[in-house]
Amino acid sequence: MKKILALILALVMALSLVACGSKDDNDTPDDGKKTNTIKVGLICIGDENDQGYTYNFIRGKEAATEALAAKGINVEWVIKYNKGENDDCTNANIECAEEGCQLIINNSYGHEPFMLKVAGKSEYKDIQFIGCTNCASRSDDLENTHNAFANIYEGRYVAGVVAGMKLQEMIDNGDITAEQAVIGYVGAFSFAEVISGFTAYYLGAKSVCPSVTMKVQFVGSWSDATEEANAASALCDAGCVMISQHSDNTTPATMAQTKGAFHTGYNNDMTGVAPDASLIGTRIDWAPYFEYAIETVFNGGTIDQDWCKGIADGSVVMTT
């Protein structure tokens, strides 16, 4: 199994390297000596201490900042941490706008209606607003709003294949029966984003372990470490020997470790918190999008209304 897993990772890395090595003419600024500064706001539902969802955004921000600096574009960030899906988000968007941000990025699905309230104000019409994982820009009448996501289902399918390989190995070794090949999936909400992800994951697992079944438990929050742990615990107690997640924290991984189950992760490498349980994970690499969006605004261009890339473009990566 280790040889097959290594081959899968090598193929994914090869695709990512090809993506990173290909640039279009717009990747090079007209003047390599530009030293201008652009101010960008980033509104986060959590903070980097979650070691998951928001931490992944911070990692993308840092990589994009470094790449842009090499092009002569300096980014000054205004970051608002721990802003809920409520009027805290509204106020954070206003604060970023009043502090002179030319581009404001909101990192949670539930931030969208509060971001739109600010983006629609006439005094902010020249500021660009991005809703990560959102969808309204395609149908609203605002020219300064944009959606951004990635084809994370691609990474979930690969992670599902790895989970299925482990389950089939356990069956072949007599550790479990075919009927005991049960996956538990901790989901935040029953939204299309989550459903498409666990569907891809299940199909990946079933492609190599035909007897696999899956139980899904929703926790009603993107980021509730306690409820995520409780859901993972309940799934293990219900007979699940493999745990995965579409939620923000590391607690499903640590609970899988505690319960003696395996785990495939999201947003970050989970081997540090669950070394015996963690097999593989997948995450969105936000650096390519941040670099593209910031450079476009800096150069006076127009950001795509809807942006979504995948493994081949380096926007979805696997973690171990």
Place the predicted regions along the sequence by residue.
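C-terminal motif of bacterial Sec signal peptides marking the signal peptidase cleavage site
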Residues: S16-A19
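Alpha-helical transmembrane segments and their juxtamembrane interfaces
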Residues: V12-M13, R138
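Bacterial signal peptide processing site
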Residues: G21-K23
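Positively charged n-region of N-terminal signal peptides that target proteins for export
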Residues: M1-L11
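A residue-level marker of the well-folded mature domains of exported/periplasmic proteins
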Residues: D30-T320
